[in-house]
Amino acid sequence: QALIVIDIQEGLVKENPFDTKNFIINTKAIIQHFRDQNIEVIFIRHSEDEGLLAMGSDNWQVYHELKPQENEKIFNKYYNSIFKDTELKEYLNRKNITDLTFVGMQVEFCIDTSVKVGFEYGYKITIVEDAISTFDNEHLPADKILSFYKEKIWRNRFAQLKTTKEILAVN
């Protein structure tokens, strides 16, 4: 089992994703819970050659409140999928990790793509539904994007969804 923390980076959090405060509070609680259980926590950083998430820039770093510990892996990606050209799948296979729990952003890009690719690869995926976020866009407000993906796309199809409270209740 592993917790995958997807794209919660300084530059994106500064842009105020939906319900930023609770998103970060819940994510911190989930990370701490997994650490307390000695379950692996893996961070994913979206990377660009230039722009908001230019590799090496301050905006590219994992959000400071979620600071990875020295023993925690960080994978950098250039695509919406956490698996494409990252060595993540090989790493998980080497460690016999088959159950993945996802927190992070953005729902309609990297979370959705990674859920579906992970499903195709045979991983059992849990999404912490109150520890994922996104932004309003020209078509839909963020809360509608969240509810659409949770209820119409993922639930009982590609992943199971649990709240932070439900995850924390498990010893």
Feature-to-residue mapping (PLM):
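Short, well-ordered beta-to-alpha junction loops that form the rim of enzyme active sites
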Residues: 46-47, 105
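Short acidic, Gly/Ser-rich segments with clustered Asp/Glu that frequently serve as metal-coordination loops
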Residues: 9-15
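N-terminal nucleotide-binding beta1-loop-alpha1 segment
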Residues: 4-7
